[in-house]
Amino acid sequence: DIRAGTTMKVDVRDGRPFTDIPETGVFSNDNVGHYVYKVAWSHDVSELLMNRTNRRQNKLEFAGCLPANGECRVILSEEWPTGWVVNSPPMQYLSDNRRFIWTSERNGWRNLYLYDMSGKLITPLTQHTTFEVVGVTKVDEAAGVVYYTARSVDNWMKVQLHRVGLDGKGDVRLTDAKYTHAVTISPDSKFIVDVIQTHKDPPVSRLLDD
């Protein structure tokens, strides 16, 4: 509180001390909160949001902490016991700031999931098991669709543009599988500037009607 000149300590480890074995000073590899990433206020400034992981970095929690008392709640978590989880997975809020698109590799492939801020999974947006998503290109809430790129054809270097409904239905590839694509979508989503190329073909810009 700037006016009052007071501070509040946020307990990112939920009461667990940083030195988990006091006699030796050894850190536990398993307790979440050793590393903290992407600290930012929620849209309504009611919570301080963050990603936090354990020292092994095979557990991730997206948490919201109250500024009044520093207590944290887990909104969602990811765990890969024998591997590693991305510390700061891409996410994108929808316009209501109560729903967000979360990127996860929980099934072994990078996919998109729609959550709300209570941590409820509304729906998987993609469920690919033979190729993975690159990232979200645009969310058109008026049309109820998400545009995203993926490595979905014979060569993983050929990035393609897809469209899927916010209900997770109607996934379709929009671009030519012969090329890799760098796309820009117009504000009204009616047109796409598509720069196509291969390792043998130089870049060519095209204007497409969605």
PLM features per residue range, with description:
Residues 1-208:
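Beta-propeller folds
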